[in-house]
Amino acid sequence: MAVLPLLLCLLPLAPASSPSQPATPSPCPRRCRCQTQSLPLSVLCPGAGLLFVPPSLDRRAAELRLADNFIAAVRRRDLANMTGLLHLSLSRNTIRHVAAGAFADLRALRALHLDGNRLTSLGEGQLRGLVNLRHLILSNNQLAALAAGALDDCAETLEDLDLSYNNLEQLPWEALGRLGNVNTLGLDHNLLASVPAGAFSRLHKLARLDMTSNRLTTIPPDPLFSRLPLLARPRGSPASALVLAFGGNPLHCNCELVWLRRLAREDDLEACASPPALGGRYFWAVGEEEFVCEPPVVTHRSPPLAVPAGRPAALRCRAVGDPEPRVRWVSPQGRLVGNSSRARAFPNGTLELLVTEPGDGGIFTCIAANAAGEATAAVELTVGPPPPPQLANSTSCDPPRDGDPDALTPPSAASASAAAKAADTGPPTDRGVQVTEHGATAALVQWPDQRPIPGIRMYQIQYNSSADDILVYRMIPADSHSFLLSDLASGRTYDLCVLAVYEDGATGLTATRPVGCARFSTEPALRPCGAPHAPFLGGTMIIALGGVIVASVLVFIFVLLMRYKVHGGQPPGKAKAPAPVSSVCLQTNGSLGPTPAPPAPEPAAPRAHTVVQLDCEPWRPSHEPTGP
């Protein structure tokens, strides 16, 4: 019976501990407003001066707004266990770092706003777990890199992706191509210089694509653009229309953009940046016939090259055209040469063979191609045995040449034959363009009058040397048919082309027509065997004169030291004077007569100790009187 009262006392406590009752809501963070009375729960902390995500968040919240604060990082534990969160706003903070897996528990999240922060990169693990994300806003950050797998978890659900106002030079285009449900893609105000062909071909639901203010010079045709009509303004456009914005890019208006010019547009502000004839003109006002390309022209290629087996070899090929041609190489066996363990192909047209073998010899073909055509050139490579060793101390000099070494003189027979051989394998040379005289640093170019071409405004000379890729231009008046090229480098091969710039009577536009090309070589700088140059003599004379002066000073110092020692350590002219004598003690035998001469010395004998008495008196000279 004693148990019954105890049970009656415990009955009021039972409902409080029942699992069916809802848990006590967490306290609302300081400076925040919380909506917990009705579903969905929300925590609103905009502009609250927060330095980090509040730890006392209600984990049941469906909406969390932390915009306009000073949050610098999102840690793994900040948003843990918030499985019901649908909307998260972290806009306009100072976020620099997002921990890997920071959003891993937000599997129900649909909208994530990270715009207006300081993110510099987005890795593969930072957005992990967002399997239901539809809106991702990353604009106004400092993003310079986007990992290829950063959007893998939300690739099938993402509908809105905003990457505008960042520092992106490259994008994972393959990953973007997997966003099959994306409706809006914002790539404007970045540093994108190119878009690969077919990058948007699988974005079937794309309705708006913004690529405004990038560095795009061309936009490749895409199947998506050909299927849907293009309208510049979304207002009044049909449901299936694609809104494409690409203004503010330095468009190069050539034949590669004809497909875009043919599409129907309402209005936009795109303009051409190049070529110079179309620069600054409204894109949609340029006629289709003005979108032209120029076929490639090979301006430089390596002369016949001979290397010993086992040594590296570099084959060079340069070409110009509009658009810039792409250079490829074909081996003597007819195979396309690419990057491998023995060869490297560079975008500038250089093919480097790291280690040559006897089987590498033959004719290599350089193929330069662009949208307007292609051009080829052959380069001969000979692989032979190593050359005989040369003496390291051997010296040689070239015989002097009459006159100035840089004067224009006809080439020698050897150089003429070498130039003729190079011309046979070089680019086609027009007989109308001739380099009649060339020395070590100058060459005279001549071409005939181009009467068949009406309305010539000027001539243009293009040339470059075998040692660099810089193409030099010279504009010549229309009434001139020769030009002296100066400031050339000695011992180099130059490829030169002359073009006529004229006004096309049919279209009224400026056009160019090649007059011809030529190849020539400047003579090497000679080392004369005569007397050394004046600067050399002047330096030698200065050194010799300085040596003479130094030697004279040393001799003078030596003489002074010797004289100083001879005079007993006193300067010359100041010899030591004899000390004054006050008295002299003389030994006498009782008389003051003249002192007899001393006897001859006798052999020394032992002396006994004797006492000698001295009579001393003041000394007087003999010529003075002794009395008054």
From Swiss-Prot:
Region (Disordered): 380-432, 587-628
Domain LRRCT: 249-295
Major location category of this protein: membrane
Disulfide bonds: 317-366
Compositionally biased intervals (Pro residues): 595-604
Signal sequence interval, chain numbering: 1-16
InterPro entries: Cys-rich_flank_reg_C, FN3_dom, FN3_sf, Ig-like_dom, Ig-like_dom_sf, Ig-like_fold, Ig_I-set, Ig_sub
Compartment(s): Cell membrane; Cell projection, Axon; Cell projection, Dendrite; Synapse
Biased composition (Low complexity): 406-429
TM segment ranges: 541-561
PROSITE patterns referenced in this protein's UniProt entry, alphabetically: FN3, IG_LIKE
Membrane topology: Single-pass type I membrane protein
Comp. bias (Basic and acidic residues): 617-628
LRR repeat residue numbers: 84-105, 108-129, 132-153, 157-178, 181-202, 205-226
Domain annotation Fibronectin type-III: ranges: 427-525
Domain of life: Eukaryota
Function: Cell adhesion molecule that mediates homophilic cell-cell adhesion in a Ca(2+)-independent manner. Promotes neurite outgrowth in hippocampal neurons.
Complex and partners: Can form heteromeric complexes with LRFN1, LRFN2, LRFN4 and LRFN5. Able to form homomeric complexes across cell junctions, between adjacent cells. Does not interact with DLG4.
Similarity comment text for this entry: Belongs to the LRFN family.
Name of the protein in its database record: Leucine-rich repeat and fibronectin type-III domain-containing protein 3
Gene of this entry: LRFN3
